[in-house]
């Protein structure tokens, strides 16, 4: 009798332990999902209006028509996962509003992360070889290996023919100055997080999903049509 009772007790304790372990695993996974999706996909960006917005699109790398009705200035960091996720959203919006939207990429590398700064310098050097966009895409694709993968090998992959000139460019102080100007502009704008988007006069702090960004673009287009 005692043996049966003891056996049942051990079985019950084992079942409780297994159940608690399973619940703990479910909680851990769901908590990661909530944190990831909540921060990255579901929470809306903080939005503010900017008076002198047009000046922020005068520098940087423009992807789209020069006469676009809507300019999205993207302050970004190649070591930022949220920026990595923002990039295809911006590409989709350019396709959706073809001829009406241009994206201007500007740098905002973390001051504590030298890899991000080196990535910014590298893509500036790729831009000298007319390879900004492919290099930009490859940096985000290879984010996990940035700092270990050679900047020159990425340049070769991006189609930069003269890799010797590319390596020389990496030490050019004028390239560093260009990155510094972007960082200063981001600070002036109050871009306290990456990415920060400026959709004409609307500043969106943080990742902006496709639906929200499309809404901002439509509002900007309507504002343009009313003012004309």
Predicted features along the sequence, with ranges:
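Extracytoplasmic thiol/disulfide redox context detector
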Residues: 2-112, 171, 177-193, 219-228
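Cysteine-centric redox/oxidoreductase cores and disulfide-bonded domains
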Residues: 7-11, 28, 35-36, 109-228
């Amino acid at each position: 009798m005692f043996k049966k009772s003891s056996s049942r007790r051990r079985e019950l304790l084992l079942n409780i332990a297994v159940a608690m372990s399973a619940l703990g695993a479910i909680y851990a996974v769901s908590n990661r999902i909530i944190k990831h999706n909540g921060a990255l996909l579901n929470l809306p960006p903080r939005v503010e209006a900017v008076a002198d917005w047009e000046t922020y699109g005068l520098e940087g790398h423009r992807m789209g028509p020069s006469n676009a009705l809507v300019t999205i200035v993207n302050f970004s960091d190649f070591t930022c996962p949220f920026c990595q996720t923002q990039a295809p959203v911006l590409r989709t919006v350019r396709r959706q509003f073809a001829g009406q939207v241009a994206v201007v990429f500007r740098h905002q590398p973390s001051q504590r992360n030298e890899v991000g700064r080196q990535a910014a310098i590298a893509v500036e050097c790729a831009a000298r070889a007319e390879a900004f966009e492919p290099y930009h895409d490859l940096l985000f694709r290879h984010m996990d290996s940035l700092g270990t993968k050679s900047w020159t090998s990425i340049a070769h992959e991006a189609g930069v023919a003269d890799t010797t000139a590319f390596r020389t460019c990496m030490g050019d102080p004028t390239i560093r100055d260009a990155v510094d100007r972007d960082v200063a502009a981001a600070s002036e704008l109050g871009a306290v997080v990456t990415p920060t988007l400026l959709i004409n006069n609307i500043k969106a702090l943080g990742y902006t999903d496709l639906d929200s960004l499309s809404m901002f673009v439509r509002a900007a287009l309507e504002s343009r049509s009313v003012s004309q």
